[in-house]
């Protein structure tokens, strides 16, 4: 603490002074509330004594006690009025503090906005916006070009696969027609010897059939055609 503060006291801001006064008012309100509770207890005690004096026939004592009761209730009423006034003053102080805080906040915000406006370069911001829009359009065009190129490549591959499938199916169909026509024109004695020819070509015999197995040549040829189609 400096000598100036020790002699004249610490320099207190208006906000701190208002806060200090508000604390003092709240402390006074609590003291008034305690005194009011004491008077209320005194009120109940006087009422009990007045009833007791009246039962005992002590009229004079009852009148004195009644006057004390009236004064006590008047004090209670005064304490209520004082407390209400102090609460009103405390609310006003709180409103002043809030207004001061809001004023300072608005002042700081105004200064901040003013500084931002001074440092903001509108022409530069406009150039940046135009350049951003230009680059975005360029990127969109390049993306469209890449998408079209990929679609073309994938489309060619799909077309090639479809054409290859058509050729294979056509060849297999032609082979099937030729084989069927040959089977229809083959004599019965050649058909009976078909298992021997198929064995010479490398067709495996069924398990357990031995050399006496005689299969149907039409079924065997059809099975071979189906196998070729599945492999393609």
Swiss-Prot record:
GO annotations under biological process? Answer: ATP export; endosome transport via multivesicular body sorting pathway; intralumenal vesicle formation; late endosome to vacuole transport; protein retention in Golgi apparatus; protein transport; ubiquitin-dependent protein catabolic process via the multivesicular body sorting pathway
* Protein transport is among the record's keywords: yes
Query: Where is the protein situated, by its record's location annotation?
Result: Cytoplasm; Endosome membrane
- Note down the stretches annotated as region Disordered: 203-232
Kindly give the Gene3D superfamilies that the UniProt entry links to this protein.
Answer: 6.10.140.1230
> Which Gene Ontology CC terms are recorded?
cytoplasm; ESCRT III complex; multivesicular body
Q: Tell me how this protein sits in the membrane.
A: Peripheral membrane protein
Residues covered by region (Interaction with VPS4): 183-232
> Keywords assigned by UniProt?
Coiled coil, Cytoplasm, Endosome, Membrane, Protein transport, Transport
Pfam families (alphabetical): Snf7 (PF03357)
Mutagenesis / variant outcome for changing residue 221 to D: Abolishes interaction with VPS4
Coiled coil location: 14-97
Extent of motif MIT-interacting motif: 219-229
Q: How does it assemble?
A: Core component of the ESCRT-III complex (endosomal sorting required for transport complex III). ESCRT-III appears to be sequentially assembled as a flat lattice on the endosome membrane and forms a transient 450 kDa complex that contains DID4, oligomerized SNF7, VPS20 and VPS24. SNF7 oligomerization into a membrane-associated filament is nucleated by association of SNF7 with VPS20; the process is terminated through association of VPS24, possibly by capping the SNF7 filament. VPS24 subsequently associates with DID4/VPS2.
Q: What does this protein do?
A: Required for the sorting and concentration of proteins resulting in the entry of these proteins into the invaginating vesicles of the multivesicular body (MVB). Acts a component of the ESCRT-III complex, which appears to be critical for late steps in MVB sorting, such as membrane invagination and final cargo sorting and recruitment of late-acting components of the sorting machinery. The MVB pathway requires the sequential function of ESCRT-O, -I,-II and -III complex assemblies. Can directly stimulate VPS4 ATPase activity.
**Which family, according to the similarity comment?**
Belongs to the SNF7 family.
Name of the protein: DOA4-independent degradation protein 4
UniProt gene name: DID4
